Amino acid sequence: MEPFALSKLHLTQYLFFTGKGGVGKTSTACAVATSLADSGKHVLLVSTDPASNLQDVFAMELHSKPTPITEVPGLSAANLDPIEAAAEYRESVIAPYRGVLPDAAIANMEEQLSGSCTIEIAAFNAFANFITDEAIQKSYDHIIFDTAPHRARTADAAAAVRME
């Protein structure tokens, strides 16, 4: 019997590791990402879990932008931070109006964009950017998503967006 080898599979550019918590999504995603990078592929590993452990696995600080993993050539990783994504989204909406509208109107806009719905929208936008950004698509052979337990349906939403 021949040993299992990822390099012999015809994998899509996007790989999703989903499921309930505690089943080994992060461990498996990291193992697959490392194996693909070791075989010469350029790989981006993205965690959409606010309680991500990627920084612990690779023993380095990670942010929302891809960071090369020094011990694994060809592998970069990112932690999608929903709070940071919400702040960036909020500012992108409000910035054009600063200095144009009164301060009270800006404060009202900030308040309106401070809820949990804004966080969800912003997190989804940040997630979708990893799929739709052409520079990211061209930079990596594979983009692997290590999802939060409650984000298991995000892949369904992404597939629906791509079908349009």
Name every feature range the model reports, one short phrase each:
Residues M1-H10, L15-F16, V23, T28-E164:
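Flexible phosphate-sensing "switch/lid" loops adjacent to ATP/NTP-binding sites
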